A protein has these predicted regions:
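The substrate-binding groove and active-site-proximal loops of carbohydrate-active enzymes
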Residues: 71, 102, 211-213
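Active-site acidic/histidine proton-transfer and metal-coordination neighborhood
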Residues: 59-66, 74-156, 166, 263-264
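Glycine-rich, proline-tolerant flexible connector loops at the mouths of alpha/beta enzymes
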Residues: 33-57
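Histidine-acidic metal/acid-base catalytic patches
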Residues: 1-6, 14-31, 57, 61, ...
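Active-site beta-loop-alpha junctions enriched in small/polar residues
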Residues: 8-12, 35-39, 72-75, 103-106, ...
Length: 265
């Protein structure tokens, strides 16, 4: 399977966007995702100012590495969709295609999500919804229900291999999802047995992910259940892998390409 592969910013979040682009190019990746929105107030994000955006655009063109998605938007009762406009403008300027989100439960969630999708559509962007065990929408069925209820034509279900599995999803479930919801997938491995509590799940997601075939997630089965044209990226933050960035990125790329070839020869 010879197809484009992306590198998610969360894998090397200490790198600036330009550094990430250069690393991706050196390791063989075709595109990147970028952290342009903080996961909580004051948390790290790399949204550039106007001058930084122009420079990043220049670097991306020079390296031949594109932007696919930007993250992370937590949709809760406090979120003002207008606050997302700078992120959307930057993503559109750089040729991005999708925004990654997750959501909590609150009155008006469906309308809020639909409004964000409508706002994103004005910038030529789609919105992917990710299942996370510690958020209000913590099963794949919950996420798919919101997509359906919103009626948004640019909405999708982000198949993160770790989150989908830890939230109770199975590879077979993906075969039943309407194909127009399956735009993007993020790959990594992890131990077969899930952590015992939410603190453990958080720690695993944020720093305990493994290279493909180092763990026990059903990665080949997940890939086999996905549409042929789904966009594949790697999201693999690790708190223990101390290899130099380029060495680690190349190892991640090689392991993921081998997985893809085995799953869909």
């Amino acid at each position: 399977m010879n197809r484009p592969l992306g590198l998610g910013h969360f894998t090397f979040l200490h790198l600036s966007p330009a550094e990430l682009v250069r690393l991706a190019r050196g390791a063989g990746f075709d595109f990147v995702g970028m952290r342009f929105n903080p996961v909580s107030p004051g948390a790290l994000n790399w949204l550039p100012d106007a001058a930084g955006l122009a420079e990043l655009d220049r670097v991306m063109r020079g390296e031949g590495v594109g932007l696919y998605d930007v993250e992370t938007v937590i949709i809760d009762a406090t979120l003002d969709p207008a606050a997302l406009v700078p992120m959307m403008e930057a993503a559109a300027r750089l040729g991005g295609q999708r925004i990654n989100t997750c959501a909590d439960r609150f009155d008006g969630l469906v309308d809020r999500f639909a409004g964000i999708c409508d706002l994103a559509n004005g910038y030529g962007l789609g919105v992917d919804l990710e299942c996370m065990a510690w958020r209000g929408l913590n099963t794949p069925a919950d996420c798919l229900a919101l997509l359906r209820d919103s009626g948004a034509g640019n909405a999708g279900y982000l198949v993160d291999a770790l989150h989908h599995t830890r939230c109770g999803g199975a590879p077979a479930d993906l075969s039943a999802v309407p194909a127009h919801y399956l735009r993007s997938a993020q790959l990594c491995d992890a131990p077969k047995e899930a952590p015992a509590d939410l603190d453990g799940l958080l720690a695993e997601a944020r720093g305990g992910r493994l290279l493909p075939d180092e763990g026990g997630l059903p990665l080949a089965e997940i890939l086999a259940a996905l549409p042929e044209d789904i966009v594949l990226s790697v999201e693999l933050p690790s708190a223990t892998d101390e290899r130099p960035d380029l060495e680690r990125a190349r190892a991640i790329h090689a392991a993921t390409v081998a997985l893809m070839a085995r799953a869909r020869p």
